[in-house]
Amino acid sequence: MPKFSEQPQSEVRQRLLDGMIRYMKLAGNDCGYKKADVAQCMKIIDGYLAALGEGKSSKLSEPKIREAVKKAVLDLNRLNEKCGGSLIETDQREYLCQLLLVAARRAGLKTRDDITEAWREW
């Protein structure tokens, strides 16, 4: 399991967004996804962070956290598949895993394992 820094989630989210937009501009029509797909990715992430109560002090049960992770990963799988697998590349995968796993730990998940691997197709 890679060690992720405890930098603010907003910074990691912004790097993810910037990387997707930068590649889209560089590759043009050949990138495989559109601004709407990037917006949908951010919506999935924001919904996930909200479901975990990001920024709140209360902790969730481990089953609730795992269910939120599973939903976000499956939603991202579907979106990436819709984009022909081009939306989530290596850099994006690392940022997404960091966002998902750090938020899960902050919400109360005890494991240091990468629980996204059970469902992740990217």
Feature roles, as predicted:
Residues 31-34, 54-65, 82-93, 97:
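Alpha-helical rod/repeat scaffolding segments in eukaryotic adaptors/tethers
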Residues 13-15, 22, 66, 78, ...:
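Arginine residue identity/basic-tract feature
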Residues 19, 23-26, 51-58, 79-82, ...:
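Surface-exposed polar/charged interaction patches
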